[in-house]
């Protein structure tokens, strides 16, 4: 399939350790989004930090297999980011992490060499777990490419307030809120300068305030095996649809594509697959 959009992720390269099964999977919000974008037929790249442990070679092999460019990523001494996970009734439960490994120790800073690379893309994606300092996210936003930021459910309020006016798309996980609470939250974000605010709510679908209009997207039915990566797949499909330079901007089509792809992701174990014995 020919590429229809170009997406660059900036942030986290991670391995998810399913210790009960002694299996690890590649993961991290930014890796997931980049891989999903590629699988959807787009060109994608990632700027992250590889450690010096065996997980680094594993992650590089996965990115190569998934046709994700990582030529502008960094390398550092220390462990790759990891988290330990168990599955309870099809839902992922994180039981530990190493504080981002080398990503936490050496967060991405945008350099002059990165700028031409980043501006060659149609959209950029990062998140609170990508560990970039707010000033670096603002620098990313200043490059003129639409930037999506996943605040998840636990980003510090100060960071939310600081970055809302900067980013083009603000994503939040809001499954713990009622429908009414989600709408109030979205409008509150807009009052603080949020341009386009999207809240995912698990099996209840998603709510989005995009281009000044409120949308409701129902979740697609799925035989849920593992919800790991559902939010990232939603983001990847939404962004590569709405920012596709070859198509007219269609919010409803982007939300539908996102819901369909997120449901598909939930039918597989591990965010992007590629299981391997824990290194």
Tell what function each PLM region has:
Residues 1-21:
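Positively charged, low-complexity intrinsically disordered leader regions
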Residues 141-148, 152-216:
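Conserved phosphate/ATP/ADP-binding segment of small-molecule kinases
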Residues 15-20, 42-123:
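Conserved N-terminal subdomain of the carbohydrate kinase-like
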Residues 2-3, 183-279:
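Conserved phosphate-binding/catalytic region of the ribokinase-like
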